[in-house]
Amino acid sequence: MTTVEVPHGSRSVILTVSAVVEETADTRSIVFAVPDELRDKFAYRPGQFLTLRIPSDRTGSVARCYSLASSPFTDDAPKVTVKRTSDGYGSNWLCDNIATGQTLEVLPPAGVFTPKSLDHDFLLFGAGSGITPVISILKSALTQGGGKVVLVYANRDEKSVIFAEELRALAEKYPTRLTVVHWLESVQGLPTADQLAAIAAPYESYEAFMCGPGPFMDTVHQALNTVGMPRARVHAEVFNSLSGDPFADQAPVEVSDEDAADAATVEVELDGEVHKLSWPRKQTLVDIMLAKGIDVPYSCQEGECGSCACTVLEGKVEMENCDVLDPEDIEAGYILGCQARPVTDHLKIEF
């Protein structure tokens, strides 16, 4: 049995695996037992993810992000779902080795792929394991909202459909609110933008969320653009491989008297509270908020996960790495707090 007893950093915790579910031949769901004293720390929103520290003989460990397939409104415990990939060390290790009773080091929930309100009509797209955060949103919207939900779910073949029985049961439970459209490559081939546009056309007024391989999401973007859905209502989840160690505590950036004198000022709104801060130009937004003891959302601190995404309302920043953001996101004012440094003297930012 693999066990972990001591956290690697101050933010992570050790959780026990309470169940492992074989969803398909190459997919496992991992359910975690969260002690009462950690309930608040591991409260999450539909569509978020957990970062797991996975043992490795080569490097000691690797960090991987996996979406929560559970809903905070319908499931008693958080559950991530992992699909084996041919070249994925983390997914292969988990599918081959993880078992009930083992422990893993885990960072608290993070991510911005989550609806601001569940009381909308939703058009959801998932491909393969991209269904994982999507089904969390789907279940949450059905139980907490009053709108309709349409899911377009693409897979290689019928055997590779994750959560097939759960989706069937939900469709029976909510016959007037939930529509599930399955797309099987073995039967229909890969979906084209025109084909997806034809499916999406009646739902142009809905909120769209998508997750899946890059080519699939590119096709969905084209389809939604064709039907005229505003970019502000289109949300995509993108995962990049983590190059750094999000579990390690970061050393504070030293600020000289000269740097402090030249600092910008920023008003940051987080969870309805406004913080007025001095922002030295060598420090990132996450740096200064952590230094002030503010519980800012973040994970990798490498600009690779999007956990710290926020919006600039006034002012301008520069970012070293922002590949996880689409050009449309940047144009809309989205930034990454772990990469953002001030350019202008005064800024307003909202999480």
Swiss-Prot record:
Cofactor note: Binds 1 FAD per subunit. Binds 1 2Fe-2S cluster.
PROSITE patterns, A to Z: 2FE2S_FER_1, 2FE2S_FER_2, FAD_FR
One MF annotation (Gene Ontology) recorded for this entry: 3-ketosteroid 9-alpha-monooxygenase activity
Catalysed transformations (reactions): androsta-1,4-diene-3,17-dione + 2 reduced [2Fe-2S]-[ferredoxin] + O2 + 2 H(+) = 9alpha-hydroxyandrosta-1,4-diene-3,17-dione + 2 oxidized [2Fe-2S]-[ferredoxin] + H2O
GO biological process, one term: cholesterol catabolic process
Enzyme Commission (EC) number: 1.14.15.30
Residue intervals of the FAD-binding FR-type domain: 10-116
Keywords noted in UniProt: 2Fe-2S, Cholesterol metabolism, FAD, Flavoprotein, Iron, Iron-sulfur, Lipid degradation, Lipid metabolism, Metal-binding, Oxidoreductase, Steroid metabolism, Sterol metabolism
Comment on pH dependence: Optimum pH is 7.
Thermal activity profile: Optimum temperature is 33 degrees Celsius.
EC class: oxidoreductase
Cofactor: FAD; [2Fe-2S] cluster
Pathway: Steroid metabolism; cholesterol degradation
InterPro entries for the chain: 2Fe-2S_ferredoxin-like_sf, 2Fe-2S_ferredoxin-type, 2Fe2S_fd_BS, Beta-grasp_dom_sf, Cbr1-like_FAD-bd_dom, FAD-bd_FR_type, Flavoprot_Pyr_Nucl_cyt_Rdtase, FNR_nucleotide-bd
Residues binding [2Fe-2S] cluster, per UniProt: 300, 305, 308, 338
Annotated 2Fe-2S ferredoxin-type domain residues: 264-351
Activity control summary: KSH activity is completely inhibited by zinc ions. KshB is specifically inhibited by Cu(2+) ions.
Complexes and interactors: The two-component system 3-ketosteroid-9-alpha-monooxygenase is composed of an oxygenase component KshA and a reductase component KshB.
Protein task: Probably involved in the degradation of cholesterol. In vitro, catalyzes the introduction of a 9alpha-hydroxyl moiety into the ring B of 3-ketosteroid substrates such as 1,4-androstadiene-3,17-dione (ADD), 4-androstene-3,17-dione (AD), 4-androstene-17beta-ol-3-one (testosterone), 4-pregnene-3,20-dione (progesterone), 19-nor-4-androstene-3,17-dione (nordion), 1-(5alpha)-androstene-3,17-dione, 5alpha-androstane-3,17-dione and 5beta-androstane-3,17-dione. KSH has the highest activity with 3-keto-Delta4 steroid substrates.
Name listed for the protein in its UniProt record: 3-ketosteroid-9-alpha-monooxygenase, ferredoxin reductase component
Organism whose genome encodes this protein: Rhodococcus rhodochrous
Originating gene: kshB
